[in-house]
Protein backbone atom coordinates (compact mmCIF):
# COMPACT_ATOMS: atom_id res chain seq x y z
CA UNK A 1 0.00 0.00 0.00
CA UNK A 2 1.39 3.38 -0.99
CA UNK A 3 -1.32 5.48 0.56
CA UNK A 4 -4.27 5.65 2.86
CA UNK A 5 -7.28 7.95 3.10
CA UNK A 6 -8.67 8.87 6.51
CA UNK A 7 -12.08 10.53 6.53
CA UNK A 8 -13.72 12.58 9.25
CA UNK A 9 -17.18 12.16 7.77
CA UNK A 10 -19.34 9.14 7.15
CA UNK A 11 -19.63 7.85 3.63
CA UNK A 12 -22.37 5.71 2.16
CA UNK A 13 -19.99 3.49 0.21
CA UNK A 14 -17.21 1.24 1.37
CA UNK A 15 -15.54 -1.57 -0.45
CA UNK A 16 -13.91 -4.61 1.06
CA UNK A 17 -10.13 -4.52 1.28
CA UNK A 18 -8.54 -6.66 -1.38
CA UNK A 19 -6.59 -9.56 0.04
CA UNK A 20 -3.97 -11.02 -2.24
CA UNK A 21 -2.34 -9.91 -5.44
CA UNK A 22 -3.62 -9.24 -8.92
CA UNK A 23 -0.12 -8.96 -10.33
CA UNK A 24 0.18 -12.52 -11.61
CA UNK A 25 3.06 -12.59 -14.11
CA UNK A 26 2.91 -8.84 -14.79
CA UNK A 27 6.26 -7.11 -14.30
CA UNK A 28 5.37 -3.65 -15.57
CA UNK A 29 6.34 -1.84 -12.37
CA UNK A 30 9.53 -3.90 -11.98
CA UNK A 31 10.67 -3.51 -15.59
CA UNK A 32 9.79 0.17 -15.94
CA UNK A 33 10.90 1.73 -12.66
CA UNK A 34 13.38 4.44 -13.72
CA UNK A 35 15.82 3.53 -10.93
CA UNK A 36 15.13 -0.20 -10.53
CA UNK A 37 13.67 0.40 -7.07
CA UNK A 38 10.93 -2.23 -7.46
CA UNK A 39 12.35 -5.66 -6.62
CA UNK A 40 11.10 -8.90 -8.24
CA UNK A 41 9.05 -9.60 -5.09
CA UNK A 42 7.48 -6.14 -5.62
CA UNK A 43 9.00 -4.60 -2.51
CA UNK A 44 10.42 -1.09 -2.82
CA UNK A 45 14.05 -0.19 -2.18
CA UNK A 46 13.45 3.24 -0.64
CA UNK A 47 17.08 4.21 -1.17
CA UNK A 48 16.51 3.98 -4.93
CA UNK A 49 12.85 5.07 -5.14
CA UNK A 50 12.52 8.53 -6.72
CA UNK A 51 9.41 9.32 -4.68
CA UNK A 52 11.16 8.49 -1.43
CA UNK A 53 14.33 10.30 -2.45
CA UNK A 54 12.55 13.50 -3.50
CA UNK A 55 9.71 13.66 -0.95
CA UNK A 56 10.80 12.19 2.36
CA UNK A 57 12.86 14.60 4.44
CA UNK A 58 14.66 11.77 6.22
CA UNK A 59 15.86 10.28 2.92
CA UNK A 60 19.25 11.82 2.04
CA UNK A 61 19.74 12.66 -1.61
CA UNK A 62 23.36 12.68 -2.73
CA UNK A 63 22.95 12.27 -6.47
CA UNK A 64 20.97 14.22 -9.00
CA UNK A 65 17.78 12.85 -10.47
CA UNK A 66 17.58 14.92 -13.66
CA UNK A 67 13.99 15.69 -14.58
CA UNK A 68 12.58 14.77 -11.16
CA UNK A 69 11.51 17.46 -8.72
CA UNK A 70 8.97 15.79 -6.43
CA UNK A 71 7.70 12.24 -6.58
CA UNK A 72 7.49 9.76 -9.43
CA UNK A 73 4.71 7.15 -9.29
CA UNK A 74 5.79 5.51 -12.57
CA UNK A 75 5.05 2.16 -10.93
CA UNK A 76 1.50 3.30 -10.19
CA UNK A 77 0.77 4.89 -13.57
CA UNK A 78 2.08 1.85 -15.47
CA UNK A 79 0.09 -0.70 -13.45
CA UNK A 80 -2.60 -2.26 -15.70
CA UNK A 81 -4.96 -2.55 -12.74
CA UNK A 82 -4.55 1.10 -11.82
CA UNK A 83 -5.19 2.10 -15.43
CA UNK A 84 -8.57 0.33 -15.26
CA UNK A 85 -9.59 1.86 -11.94
CA UNK A 86 -12.58 4.19 -12.15
CA UNK A 87 -11.77 7.88 -11.99
CA UNK A 88 -12.88 9.72 -8.87
CA UNK A 89 -16.03 11.78 -9.00
CA UNK A 90 -15.32 14.08 -6.08
CA UNK A 91 -14.22 17.64 -6.85
CA UNK A 92 -12.39 17.76 -3.50
CA UNK A 93 -9.77 15.46 -5.05
CA UNK A 94 -9.23 17.50 -8.22
CA UNK A 95 -5.78 19.01 -8.75
CA UNK A 96 -5.56 22.60 -7.53
CA UNK A 97 -2.77 23.46 -10.01
CA UNK A 98 -0.53 21.75 -12.57
CA UNK A 99 2.93 21.23 -11.05
CA UNK A 100 4.25 20.06 -14.44
CA UNK A 101 3.67 23.56 -15.77
CA UNK A 102 6.17 24.95 -13.25
CA UNK A 103 9.91 24.98 -13.87
CA UNK A 104 12.75 24.93 -11.35
CA UNK A 105 13.15 28.72 -11.47
CA UNK A 106 9.54 29.15 -10.33
CA UNK A 107 10.10 26.91 -7.32
CA UNK A 108 13.43 28.57 -6.50
CA UNK A 109 11.87 32.04 -6.61
CA UNK A 110 8.85 31.15 -4.49
CA UNK A 111 8.62 32.28 -0.86
CA UNK A 112 6.92 30.35 1.96
CA UNK A 113 3.72 32.43 1.77
CA UNK A 114 3.35 31.76 -1.96
CA UNK A 115 4.11 28.06 -1.40
CA UNK A 116 1.45 27.84 1.31
CA UNK A 117 -1.10 29.66 -0.87
CA UNK A 118 -0.43 27.38 -3.85
CA UNK A 119 0.38 24.07 -2.18
CA UNK A 120 -1.14 24.32 1.30
CA UNK A 121 -3.91 21.85 0.44
CA UNK A 122 -1.69 19.42 -1.44
CA UNK A 123 0.67 16.56 -0.59
CA UNK A 124 3.58 18.83 -1.57
CA UNK A 125 3.53 20.21 1.97
CA UNK A 126 4.90 16.84 3.07
CA UNK A 127 8.26 17.58 1.47
CA UNK A 128 7.99 21.34 1.94
CA UNK A 129 9.42 24.21 -0.05
CA UNK A 130 12.95 23.77 1.33
CA UNK A 131 13.16 20.17 0.08
CA UNK A 132 11.64 21.10 -3.29
CA UNK A 133 14.23 23.88 -3.68
CA UNK A 134 17.05 21.45 -2.77
CA UNK A 135 15.77 19.02 -5.41
CA UNK A 136 15.52 21.80 -8.00
CA UNK A 137 19.10 22.94 -7.35
CA UNK A 138 20.52 19.41 -7.30
CA UNK A 139 18.68 18.29 -10.41
CA UNK A 140 19.55 21.43 -12.36
CA UNK A 141 23.27 20.89 -11.72
CA UNK A 142 25.25 18.77 -14.17
CA UNK A 143 25.36 15.15 -13.05
CA UNK A 144 28.74 13.98 -11.79
CA UNK A 145 30.26 11.00 -13.59
CA UNK A 146 29.50 7.73 -11.90
CA UNK A 147 32.32 5.98 -10.07
CA UNK A 148 31.96 2.40 -11.32
Give short role names for the model-derived ranges.
Residues 28-50, 65-92:
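Iron-sulfur cluster-binding cysteine motifs and their immediate structural context
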Residues 53, 57-70, 101-125:
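Short Fe-S-cluster ligation motifs
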Residues 11-20, 40, 59-60, 82-87:
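Inter-helical turn/loop segments and adjacent helix faces that build the functional surface
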Residues 14-24, 61-72:
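Immediate flanking context of iron-sulfur cluster ligation sites
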Residues 52-53, 79, 83-112:
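Conserved Radical SAM active-site core
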Residues 83, 140-147:
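Alpha-helix capping and inter-helical loop/turn segments
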Residues 1-32:
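Ferredoxin-type iron-sulfur electron-transfer modules and their immediate structural context
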Residues 117-120, 125-143:
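Long, compositionally biased charged/polar accessory segments in the mid-to-C-terminal portions
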Amino acid sequence: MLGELILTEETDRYDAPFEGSRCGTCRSCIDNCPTGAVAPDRTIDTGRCISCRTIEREQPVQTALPGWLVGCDACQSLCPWNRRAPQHRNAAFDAVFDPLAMDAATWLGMDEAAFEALCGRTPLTRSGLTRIRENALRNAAPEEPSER
